[in-house]
A protein has these predicted regions:
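ABC ATPase NBD Q-loop/coupling interface
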Residues: 2-20, 161-164
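Conserved ABC ATPase signature
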Residues: 74-78, 82
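ABC ATPase C-loop
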Residues: 91-92
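ABC-type ATPase nucleotide-binding domains, specifically the catalytic core motifs of the NBD
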Residues: 13, 38-55, 63-68, 159, ...
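Catalytic Walker B motif of ABC-type/P-loop ATPase nucleotide-binding domains
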Residues: 99-103
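Helical segment within the ABC ATPase nucleotide-binding domain
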Residues: 113-126
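Conserved catalytic motifs of ABC-family nucleotide-binding domains
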Residues: 95
Length: 177
């Protein structure tokens, strides 16, 4: 197969080339530079940019206000949820057209999980497409335009997020009732 991004085949491109074409990725774990400050982590996200990215950084701080307060603090001293915010913020510094998130709420408290989903919705409202893999299927489908339920690596169900939430088979088999 091949991967198209805005009509361009990016299958064989290097990660840097994919980023320059508009793709950003936030891995599930080890997704911050622990010895760098919050601000330095965000700057790392802008490494391919040759313009003034201060406006983008301010947008990230508006999205995640706690990061502005902790901008000089090493990312390794942050909570799990705050580290996730740094990782998403760093990805947003690339000004992506597609943001890929791998288990963004893994290992965070329910309160932080709700806040992260709210922030993901805010990102979505800016027009950035979001491709998310998430174990918390109910909450992910609740914000999804389109959902895919995979079973042993194969796509079993595809529909709008709400339709999948309303699907009795999906509810019974994957959502606990």
């Amino acid at each position: 197969g091949k991967v198209l991004l805005e009509g361009e085949d990016i299958t064989r491109l290097s990660p840097q080339q994919r980023v320059s074409r508009g793709m950003a990725f936030v891995p599930q774990t080890q997704n911050v530079f622990v010895s760098l400050s919050v601000e330095e982590n965000l700057e790392m996200g802008a490494y391919l940019r040759d313009d003034d990215f201060s406006g983008t950084m301010e947008q990230v701080f508006e999205l995640f206000p706690v990061l502005k307060k902790k901008r000089q603090q090493p990312a390794g001293e942050l909570s799990g949820g705050q580290r996730q915010q740094v990782a998403v913020g760093r990805a947003l510094m690339t000004q992506p057209s597609v943001l890929m998130l791998d288990e963004p709420t893994a290992g965070v408290s329910p309160i932080v999980m709700d806040e992260l989903f709210e922030r993901i919705l805010e990102v979505k409202k800016t027009g950035i497409a979001i491709l998310m893999v998430e174990q918390n299927a109910r909450q992910a489908l609740g914000i999804a335009d389109r959902g895919f339920v995979l079973v042993t690596g194969e796509n079993r169900y595809t529909d709008s997020g709400q339709a999948l939430l309303d699907n009795e088979d999906v509810r019974r088999s994957f959502l606990g009732g």
